Design a protein with these regions (language model features):
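Short, Lys/Arg-enriched, Trp-marked, Pro/Gly-tolerant hinge/linker segments that flank
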Residues: 2-33, 56, 69-77, 81
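…primarily DNA-binding HTH/wHTH and HhH modules…
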Residues: 6-17, 21, 116-136
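Basic, amphipathic alpha-helical hairpins
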Residues: 26, 33-47, 67, 71, ...
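Terminal helix-turn-helix DNA-binding modules in bacterial transcription factors
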Residues: 50, 69-109, 132-136
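Append "Primarily bacterial transcriptional regulators
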Residues: 50-59, 63, 67, 101-109, ...
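Coiled-coil-like amphipathic alpha-helices with heptad-repeat character
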Residues: 59-60, 78, 125
């Protein structure tokens, strides 16, 4: 795979992939607020559907409908995409932070669960991803 294929500076979250389909500004604002909540709550591992819905003063089902309408993803898949994008950013921008600690910061208690989720998303492990992006 080419380095450009994994350049996080040019990647979009799944909900951004269909930017050519204009959405109501309220969807964009809603998604932005959800992303902020997920990132802020990752270290404390309080980024589940119930916690996020509660933080937005929504019921779980209402939250599920809104996030799916705005992104085309289930809440779980959307949360995972935000976690992986943040992990990729930390791996590239914070070279002094251990990979295990990047996983913890992104809400993964288990290093192997983090590695497996990262591989599924990016097609390579976090160490390989970091090395690829820091060999510039």
């Amino acid at each position: 795979m080419k380095k450009e294929d994994h350049d996080i500076r040019h990647q979009r979250l799944p909900h951004e992939a269909h930017a050519h389909h204009p959405r109501r500004p309220s969807h964009d604002e809603f998604v932005h607020n959800v992303v902020r909540l997920i990132i802020a709550s990752m270290p404390a591992r309080r980024h589940g559907v119930a916690e996020i819905a509660s933080s937005l003063s929504l019921g779980e089902q209402t939250f599920r409908r809104h996030i799916f309408a705005a992104t085309g993803l289930t809440p779980k898949d959307f949360i995972t995409s935000v976690q992986m994008r943040e992990a990729a950013r930390l791996l590239v921008d914070c070279f002094d932070v251990r990979i295990r600690d990047v996983g913890r910061r992104c809400g993964f208690d288990d290093a192997s669960a983090f590695t497996n989720a990262f591989k599924k998303c990016y097609g390579m492990g976090p160490r390989q991803f970091r090395n690829l992006h820091n060999d510039e």
